[in-house]
Amino acid sequence: MNRKRKKIIGLGLLLLLAPSAGYAQGYSCGNVGLFCSPDTLRGAQLGAFSSVVYRQMRGLSLAGVINSVGGDMRGVQISGVSNVVKGGNGVQLSLFNNVSSSPFRGVQLSALSNVSMGMKRGLQIASANVSSSYMRGLQVGGYNYADTLNGSQIGILNVCVSHPRGVQIGVINYSRDTVAHK
């Protein structure tokens, strides 16, 4: 079987103005630039405006505006505005919002909102936290929502559809589950 192996690119210093001009196919162990966009990252990346990884990220990604990982992420995303990931394990830290389009395990910390399509085990802290599907962990914020809550919600308004385990602590707590312990 003839498989084409990806090569390690190494450290890239990209001070290009076009985002697509900074694209590097293969593994990158480090990037620094205005717009960083390797195929796969195993290491650290610092993008002044954006830090985009098209497939997998293992490591640290820092961006002034937005971080985006098109595949699985294991590591830390820190940005000034927003972090977006398909799914993974680790920490997302931003001023405005964090988004995971599939189940996430770890910590999402933001001033405005955290959204995930499920939290395997984790912590969401923001003004508004949404865990579509299930939440196994803790949500702390003004508004907390989970489809299935196996954990705790601490906030002003806490909402869940099903509440098999855990506790809701807040001014208004709502659960459609009639057997939930409130």
What residue spans do the PLM features occupy?
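Surface-exposed, glycine- and small/polar-enriched segments that build interaction surfaces at terminal
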Residues: 23-182
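N-terminal signal peptide c-region/cleavage motif recognized by signal peptidases
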Residues: 18-21
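Bacterial N-terminal signal peptides that target proteins for export
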Residues: 2-10
